[in-house]
Every structure is written in structure tokens, then in C-alpha cells.
Amino acid sequence: MKFPLALLLLQIVFCNEGFAQNPFWEKIKNQPITLDLESGMENYTLEKLKFSILKSSQTLSALKLKDDTAFDYTPDELLGYRARDNFYHLGDINLTIRPQGDSSWSRFSSAQTRRNIKPLMTTGNILAVADMAPTLNDIPLQVIRSWEQDNGDLVLRFTITNITRKAYEIGALGIPMIFNNNMDWKSLDSAHADNVFFDPYIGKDAGYLQVNRLHGNGPSLLVLPQENAGFEAYRPLNDDPTPRSITFEGFHEWLIHSKALTQTAWKGVKQWNDPTSEVLDPGETKSYALKLVLAPSIREIEKELLTQGQPVAIGAPGYLIPQDNPAKLFIKYTQKVKRIDVYPTGSVSVKQLGSTSGKWLSYKVTGNKWGRSRLTITYEDERTQSIHYKVIKSEQRIVGDLGHFLTNEQWYDNPNDVFGRSPSVITYDYETKSHVTEHQNAWFAGLSDEAGAASWLAAIMKQLVQPDPQEINKLKEFAAQTMFGRIQHKEGRDKFGVVKSLFYYEPDSLPTGTYSDSINYETWGAWSKKEASDVGRSYNYPHVAAAHWVLYRLARNYSQLVTEETWQTYLERAFQTGVAMVEKAPHYAQFGQMEGSIFLFILMDLKKEGLLDQASKLEGLMKERALHWKTLNYPFGSEMPWDSTGQEEVYLWSRYFGFDQKAAVTLNAILAYVPAIPHWGYNGSARRYWDFVYGGKLARIERQLHHYGSALNAIPLLTAYRDNPADFYLLRVGHAGMMGALANVTQDGFAPGAFHSYPSTLANDGITGDYGSGFYGYAVNSGTYIIKHPEFGWLAFSGNLSETGGKIRVDITTASRARVFLAEQQLWVTLDAGQLKSLEYDPETTKVRLTLSASKESYAENTLLKIGQNSGYKVKGYKKNAQGYFVIPSEVKSVLLVKSN
């Protein structure tokens, strides 16, 4: 869900004085400046970086690339505003300690009550050093901070000495990571020039923080453990007063120890890693250090980690393990593996397979027990690395469970509903096990917008993947009675227009008792009927277009599933919905839409069916939009100043119309916010941090794990991979994002909007929220990928691979079993009806045999098979029909694919 236009306008008054105009910063001026800026700064130049520290605090005031000094990794434009107590800067420290044996903790922060530090003499590689006692409020320990260089790289070190006569336990030790992710009042151009995104690998001694520029180009800044600084936990710094919003996610800190927090603020929540503490005896000293290095590019992060002597892990396909589809894990480090521990015990099985020519250790990881699982690898030098998996059901079972839950638990059948929402698949609260039939934000209960439409969208998209006659019968009722005619106008001036919500708040016009007294309706989101009936929000149109399109596919490709209307009728409605979006919602239609790829799929089907007049009109409207994007440096706006969902459509149309430069810009921008990290929650997880506010139950600004952006951004990533099958990185992040749509589905089929990353929660959100937009991404994009990697050998993503006598066999494990890509031949096979069981490939002859599923679950009379144009393959013994299909009768069990002469 997005902001209303009135609030949007407040956000996009882009000007250099924007910060000063913010009421918060005006108010903060009344607070005393405690960070002395007047005393100046010290400047330093390293091999690749230039940086400055304030003389008064020795905190970082600038961090720049040596060859690009216009860009600063720090929030430099806010330095003057943030020169007050409680504002964190890079170089600060948070400590929570207690005398050994005491039960209560005491917290000390160098930012809380800012005082000038005591500079000390430098020696050797030490660039600046200070005693932090004045700014740590009478802490009983001595804390010395130093900035150092190590072979041209920057090191931040804290040396802590127990100067008392009693032992002290350090229960939390955090180093704030203050980089410039604040986009307040910035245009898209200035944000991409100035700002960064950062994501953690919470992997203990192998952990790191990656800091990428928004445009995805140039080097990636990595923060690494240098000494005694394992990445144990990642805490949001909500005590920093900088206001969090749709343009500022907030800052976080790198936690080396976290025991005190797990006993207090995070009590009862199972953390990613086991919490630790450190006891310092009287007179004992311990040093903690982080190092900042540059990887040449995002794709070269792992290469740089190896150069820096860090343990590196690569999962293939990743860290979500379906129970029917074991994964491979490749590990490389200078030291031998001493042991691998699994928690919970037995949750996964780990089997060593050998090593590669490049000395990567290879393992097979099999998922046994549903839920989170952690591997802790201990190396011979006692360094530890944690790798975070989640074991899930098979893709087929998850999607089956999802469809059942949506069309049963979420099925809303109430003929007396005054808002006309019955029958439908409605928003659901998993914590109360109830339908969300009213809410202070109208769209939650209104069957439109993302949080309202997502559930019925997921239910309909599920039928594209796994058609189920009983579910389809219910959804046909919804489409005929509720969607087409209520959510979407089917006649009159607004014909084909899509409303913002069927639910609205007008107590004077409806019977007493319609609205609950326990809900606060004094909010901007409690829309009136007029507001709810508005058809000017373009983002509501792709949901409806996708529903019409799926019904077209079901009516066209299956003989008995959908017969109420002709396939032509459904395709016409899908086409008209795309036209209506541009004509009735032109303001927001200028932006890329979430699920906007649906209009390309509709266009291709119009062409396939010979409906050339409609195809020409739709293509013309879409080209006008793409031409507009071509004129922009970064066409990634939306209702928000910056967004991560329009890139899906921007990329596909730019690619379609041959705007290759804009497609490349879009792809690089996606890679900036979709990380490849050995953690199921972050790997492939597209950045989003505000939709818990507009589509969640626990509403707060927070990095969301596998929000719908994961699977939507996977569409361009995997499309780009099929164009460039040597780019293994694209496959890794694209497949991980695709699987993100299944990551958070519960064992009984409930699908939340996203997973909460806050260490105080680490759980699914309580309602369905925006989930369906992500499942759309899985439905249209999921596939099996087969590659021969130059280092790791033959691999299958969403498939079980075996090799016999040089021949390859892959059993297909996606939910649809309808798409497979053989990278070596750039062979892309898709089925619009029917299912694949396996693919067999002989590299010597290049022949490919497809075994077709004999299962009746596909409900298809014929297998409708397509082969991508780039491979040069054809189906032996069959010719394409007018629609481009190889039509294979259902009784045929296998077909042979051969290269065309």
C-alpha cells in the first residue's frame, strides 16, 4: 500500500532546503549542539578511500571514494542537524555491562551524552586514537578507540580494559553502522547519486555488511570482522532521533555480543545466532576491530571476501530448502573445517561430497524438519561461520496448501455484506483466525489496493500453476459477481475502471452496528465512499488484469475448467483493463507498476491469438510509457519518492522495445537492493521497509524479509539470466527472489505479507497483507534451471539432478512443473498446459528428452509446449500450430528435442 496523494506531495518537495523545512529538524534546532563541529576535522587518504574525522569526537564526518569525491558514504548533508545528543555517527559504540554475578545490566553509549574525547598519541599504523571516557558517562571500563590502516584499508578498533578490581561481563557490544540511506527530500537523480543501501550477513566471524550505491554501479563497501568482531546480531537503532519514514529506513548496529538484549528487549525471541557475552577480569584487555574494504563491484563481493581471507559460502540454489529438493553448499577458506553443527538437531542433514578444482568444499544439505535451521561451521583456527537455512515443504505442496487456505479459511461468503464483498477471498488475520472485514485503513478490508486484493489475486494466480476445479469454481463466482461489476466497473462512464476499495467509512449512511466501536476511524485511511470509489490509482489495475488473464488461459487451454464465458471474452477484458489503466489513471500510470509485466503477457497473447488491432493499441500505449522512462535517468518512482516494485515493468518494456541502456540501468539498480547472502531471509530479498505500515498488522518502518518485491524483481533478474546464461550471479539472486514468495508460507498454507526482521520479533506478520503480488511473481516466473558451472559442475535450481555416463537427468520440482531452462543450450521450454516430469540431456549429441507427467492433476487434454527462439531446438515429429505451440496428446509420455538443421 502507498501514500495518498496529499501525503505524497509533502514528500516530494525536492529542494536543498528540504531538511530545514522538516518540522522535526526545526524543532531539533532548540536542542544544544554537543558535537563540536567548529573545532574542525582531520583528513586522511588511503589507497582507495578518503575520510575525515571530527577533532572533537573522532567520529567519521566523511567517507569518500578516492576517485569520486562528490559521493559520500556518510549522511553528510545532515551532519549539522545531527550534531546533538543521541544521534549516532560511525565511530560510536554501545556497551551494556554488569559486574559478574549481578542480575541487572547498565548501558553506556558514546552518543547519549556527547562530550569531547581525549586524543592520545598515535604510533605505527594508527591514524587517530582517543580515550572515550568523557563521552561514556563514567563507565567503569576503559575504552580506547583507534582509526588505523591495514594494507591501505581502514580499520575501526575499540580496545576495552577492565581497570576495576572486579570482573565485568559485557552483555552487549554494538558498533553503529551509519551510512547514508536517508533519502528525505531527494529526487530520484540525487538519491541515486548520494545514497546507499546496506544489508547484513549475520554470519559470526564470516559475517559482513555490504553497502551498495543505489544505482548498483561501482564498488561495494564491505564492513568485515578484523578481530574479535563476529557479526552476532543486527539491531535497529530506534533510539537515534532521525525520523524514520518511507524515505529513511533507519540505522542499525553491528552487534558483537547480544546476551543482555536477549534477556531484556528481545526476551523470548529465538535469534539468528546464539547470544554471547564476554567477561573481563580485573586488568584484562580485549580488542574488537572492524575493517572497511572495497569490492570492485557487487558481483565481486565474494571474490573480495576471499582476497581478505574471509570464509565464503555459496548455496546452490540458496538457503530455502524444499523437503523434496536438497541443496548444495560450497565453502572456501584458508583453514580446514573442524566440525559442522546443526541447530535444531536433525533439522537438516549435511553430507560432504568432496572438493572442486578450485578447492571449494562441496556439501549436500537435505531438509528434514520444517522451519529455521542453522549450520555453524567451526574452522581449525576456531573461527566460526553461521549459515541460515529454512526448510520448507516441496514447492508443489506449499502451493497446494496455499490454494486450500485461500479458498477455504479466507473464503468470505456473506450475502448480506453491505459493501458487496461477497463472495470473495478476503484479507485474513492469522493471529485471531478471522477475516478482516473492517479496518481503519479501508483498503485492508476493501478487496482492492495491494493489501485488499492480494489474497484473491494469489488464489487466482495459484490456478495458473496448479488448477483445481473446486477452487476455480469458487473463484469464478468471485470474478463474475464481485470483481467484474463491483471492484471493476463493467458499464457506464467508468467502464473497466478499478476502484480503490469496496469497504468505506460512512457511519451516517449505513445501519447502526456496521462499524466496530473498538476501531479508531479518525484516520486518513478511513476513506469515504467517494474516496474509495475513485478509479485513479493505476496500481489497482494489474491485479484485475491478471485475474482476467488467468481465466483466459484456463478457458483457452483446458476444456472443462472455465466455460461460463469464452476465452475471447476474458482476454478482451484483460486488454481493456490495461487500456483503462492508462486512460483513467494517467498520473500513476506514468510509473512502473507492481505486476506490470502482466500487460506484456496480455500483449503477447493478443498477438498469438491474431487480435492485432487490440495488440497494436496496447503496444502503443505501453510504448508511450516506455519512451517516457527512456528520458529519465532512474525511472523508479511511484507513489513513493523511491520504490522497488516498478523496476519489474520498466525492465521488461525497455527490453521489449530495445531500450537496452535503460534495461541495463534498471537491472543494476535491482542488484543494488537484492543481495546474495548466506541467509534465507535476506538472500534474494528485495528491499522494502514501509509496507508493514500500509499492509501489515504490526505496523512499523522495518526491513521486510521477502515482501512481494522479492518475487517481482526476480522476473527481470531471471529474464536477464536467460539472455546471459553465463551470469551465475543473476541466477542466484533471481531464483532466491522467486523462492521468496514461498519462504514465509506456514505449514497450513497461510501467507503473510512479509517476515519481521527486527530481533525483537523475527516472525511472520499477522495478516495476509500484500502477499499476493509476490505470488504473482512466482506463478508467472517460476522454473527449473540447469547449468554447468565452470567451478561447481552440474547444478539444478528447483530440480533434482543426477549424472550417469555423462548424461544429465533432472526431475522437475517447481509447483507448476511447466518451465525449464537448460543454460548450456539457452533452451527455454514452457508449457501452457500439461506438466513436465523430467528433462534428460546428452551433452555429446545435444539431444534433450522431456518426460511428460501422466498425472491427471494437470486437467489438460493436450500438452501445449513452447520452445524459446534462441536455442534452435524443435520437437521431433511435431510441428508448431498457429499459436506457436507444439501440441502433444496427453497419452504421449515423452518427446525428443533436437537441434534444427
Language model features: what each stretch is:
Residues Q21, A133-V143, Q149-G207, R383, ...:
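Acidic (Asp/Glu-rich), glycine- and aromatic
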Residues M183-S187, E304-N325, Q385-T427:
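Low-complexity, Pro/Ser/Thr- and charge-rich linker/hinge segments at domain boundaries
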Residues R299-I321, G620-E624, H628, Q647, ...:
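Terminal, non-catalytic domain-edge segments
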Residues E278-P296, V892-L897:
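Short Pro-Gly-centered flexible turn/kink motifs
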